[in-house]
Amino acid sequence: MEEENISLPLSQDTFQDLWDNVSAPPISTIQTAALENEAWPAERQMNMMCNFMDSTFNEALFNLLPEPPSRDGANSSSPTVPVTTDYPGEYGFKLRFQKSGTAKSVTSTYSEILNKLYCQLAKTSLVEVLLGKDPPMGAVLRATAIYKKTEHVAEVVRRCPHHQNEDSAEHRSHLIRMEGSERAQYFEHPHTKRQSVTVPYEPPQLGSEFTTILLSFMCNSSCMGGMNRRPILTILTLETQEGIVLGRRCFEVRVCACPGRDRKTEETNSTKMQNDAKDAKKRKSVPTPDSTTIKKSKTASSAEEDNNEVYTLQIRGRKRYEMLKKINDGLDLLENKPKSKATHRPDGPIPPSGKRLLHRGEKSDSD
């Protein structure tokens, strides 16, 4: 029985008793921190309201902030059609290729006559970069491929699907690669979709005047679904970190199985075309003979041939035949008749009186 009379102090039945026992001081007795101004004057409240109403509303308050540029995009101001003219700039940006000849065993060779690089698939080509003075800190070298012909220049140069599927790299769709540097970065412009690769510019080593970069092209020029025998140009630019172009060089590239043979063939064809053009100019400069003289000689010769040619004429009726035969015989007789001899004029002077001089044995008309 004693256990039943015991009640828990925090049970629902005893909560009201507990709440009643809680004592709290009245609000009026609570001390608050003293303010400099215990009350806001009416004038101050009015001034604040007017200032708030006069302030203009910023319409750009709720606009989204622009997204930071992604690493996949190059310079956002990249033109739709890149410039292909050479521009050395104030730093004297130049390129130089190794001389390797036209032997069949070479994997890369450059033609100065055609300004064209011939190389094998995925084989490195050494390119020497020369500058007149040091560029700004953080400068980079960028390589971009575009199509040469006007009808193809708007298209993006990519690798063919066959070579892409055989590659597991993240940048497997890029045609150009820069080998030998772990700091190479591959970009695809978000708007033009053109692909490029960059490496930081490194100053020449001690005792050298140039910096060497290694380029490799990962698809043949004849690959279906890729370049498909369309000629391409490689644009190599010197840029700042912000993408400002400091120098530009451009050269044509052909990726083939036998660079030496193709270079020799194309150089021969180019020289032949230039010689033919010079010969054509020389022929145009030589004065042509008078066309009227040629025309007259041709007309005279043709008329003579027509006169000597024999024709056959079919005639109906004996009487008509006899008549035409007489006409033909008369024409033949007239043509074969010897020309009349010219009047014989005696040699020697003629006397002033008009009388003919008598020769020995001749008599005068008066006799």
Swiss-Prot record:
This is Cellular tumor antigen p53. The gene is tp53. Pfam families: P53, P53_TAD, P53_tetramer. Residues 1-47 are annotated as: Transcription activation (acidic). Residues 308-337 are annotated as: Oligomerization. GO terms for biological process: apoptotic process; DNA damage response; positive regulation of transcription by RNA polymerase II; protein tetramerization. One of its GO terms (cellular component) is nucleus. Residues 342-363 are annotated as: Basic (repression of DNA-binding). PROSITE patterns: P53 (PS00348). Binds DNA as a homotetramer. It comes from the Eukaryota. The lineage of its organism: Eukaryota, Metazoa, Chordata, Craniata, Vertebrata. Residues 254-261 are annotated as: Interaction with DNA. It comes from Tetraodon miurus. Multifunctional transcription factor that induces cell cycle arrest, DNA repair or apoptosis upon binding to its target DNA sequence. Acts as a tumor suppressor in many tumor types; induces growth arrest or apoptosis depending on the physiological circumstances and cell type. Negatively regulates cell division by controlling expression of a set of genes required for this process. One of the activated genes is an inhibitor of cyclin-dependent kinases. Apoptosis induction seems to be mediated either by stimulation of BAX and FAS antigen expression, or by repression of Bcl-2 expression. Residues 262-306, 332-367 are annotated as: Disordered. The record marks K104 as: Interaction with DNA. InterPro entries: p53-like_TF_DNA-bd_sf, p53/RUNT-type_TF_DNA-bd_sf, p53_DNA-bd, p53_tetramer_sf, p53_tetrameristn, p53_transactivation_domain, p53_tumour_suppressor. Residues 86-273 bind DNA. Residues 291-302 have a biased composition (Low complexity). Keywords: Activator, Apoptosis, Cell cycle, Cytoplasm, DNA-binding, Metal-binding, Nucleus, Phosphoprotein, Transcription, Transcription regulation, Tumor suppressor, Zinc. A motif (Nuclear export signal) lies at residues 322-333.
